[in-house]
Amino acid sequence: LNTCGPSTGLFHEFEYKLAKKISDSVETVDMFRMMGSGTEACMGAARIARLATKHKNIIKMGGAYHGWSDQMAYGIRVNGTKFTQAHGVPLNCFMFIQETTPNDLDDLEKKLRLNQFRGGTAAVYMEPVGPESGTTPITVEYVKGVERLCRKYGALLVFDEVVTGFRIGMAGAQGYFGVSPDLTIFGKVIAGGYPGAGGIGGKREYMKYLGAGLDSSGKKIHKALVGGTMTANPLSCCAGYFTLEEIERTNACQKAGQMGDRICAGLKELVKKHGLPFVVWNTGSICHLETVGTMHYQINWKKPWEIPAILGETGIRQKEMEHMGAAYMA
């Protein structure tokens, strides 16, 4: 703050240090660029993917959250909802966005195959632990299957690691699962709790589509339009750099993961003891306790007339939820 102020709009020492720290920690990140938020990073990655592949369509997992931009407001929270949550967004904004059912590789391949005849698939976006930070969990086999299909059909694999980055491990979920995305979205922790927490990292052959000037060969190429007044501001970059340093020094990811395992084990014992119709699971420190309607597996979105009766069962669970609360208080 004493040497360059809170925001200069110019390159500075801690922008470099933070980028290098992320690149050193995450193997697939040859190059990194700060953005103003995870939402902006997701927008930028879509533009990179379309420039790099010359394809149009983006496929995301149904229910996943990749920010609140017009295009990504499709199929959020619950798989199959499509545009129904995107109030205020014209339907033509969703012309080149699709959702695929989590854990269903056949559904994804069907869309990839059909897209070959309607503009191609530029990228497949996924939260590597499942939509909404793993609220709908997915299998390791599915994650690796998505990577395989992206390679087969020439689409970029985009990992949204806003939640999982530097939390599941220093290498994020991709290091945990042993998968190599082409682009990675970062957020939250990379600014140490300060504003401007967003970033895109990835392979050099794709990251070259950001910024100005020529690519490494000297050939002029079209670049993705990105920006932001507070992007890469010195305060946030400095906070982010020292936060990541401290996470690594203290082995915080592993310790937090062990705590997540412990709390979920305890919750599972309570659920079993009281015979509650609840579900508990975790990936490291990302813990879930599901008690309500979105986990009604018998819901069939193709038969909407059956849904009210199924959701009515949630009311029956009120007593069990009271028991759960009492168990917490005991």
Task: Please place each PLM-identified region on the residue numbering.
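Conserved N-terminal phosphate-binding loop of PLP-dependent enzymes in the Aspartate aminotransferase
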Residues: 1-330
